[in-house]
């Protein structure tokens, strides 16, 4: 939250609070709760220097990860390219170009699972036969033949209004508030506390890896489910 008052500016990053982060914890008498660690940067050189010091701190506490040491070169077919309208015919020349450019990963973005509206059609996560005659395995296999790791886009936490099996999904799978299923932008938010939802997510990942041959998954998150669910809440 950034605000300017009387020629001065202050910048606040909040943690687990109800006002800024839609989070709260009710404590019974005698009970306590330890919040997440907080960091404060104090400098004399101004805002930019303060941000520099905070960035140094974040880099220092970041867990060791080889992917952070050598970032891979990834080609994604969405932005300034196919925008969720991929087909085998459109992908093959892009795969060639990405390989020639030295890319290590090639990711097929949204839309691979529907013939129509990629946004509201999320949830079942099965390839469109119309977009990929002979199966999505064909372009995925070609990506590997060109020396790259194939990837698919996924938003596992959402189910769209136009999902083919939306009427078969139990209401208990979703966030609910005021007795109604929470929705945002033609999508519903799954509740991953539910073991059935966990099993569903696992089955989707297993299918993408073991059946389609995917070696990379781009996890996206595009909706705002608000303050969460009232089901079994504190």
Label every PLM stretch briefly:
Residues 110, 128, 141-143, 196-234:
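Active-site and adjacent substrate-binding regions of carbohydrate-active enzymes
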Residues 90-113, 211-212:
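Catalytic domains of carbohydrate-active enzymes, especially glycoside hydrolases
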Residues 35, 71-77, 104-108, 150-154, ...:
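Hydrophobic faces of well-ordered beta-strands that scaffold small-molecule active sites
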Residues 113-167:
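Acidic/aromatic-lined carbohydrate-recognition and catalytic surfaces
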Residues 70-72, 81-85, 129, 149-151, ...:
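Active-site-adjacent "subsite" loops/lids of carbohydrate-active enzymes
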Residues 30, 75, 98, 106, ...:
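Conserved, mostly hydrophobic/aromatic
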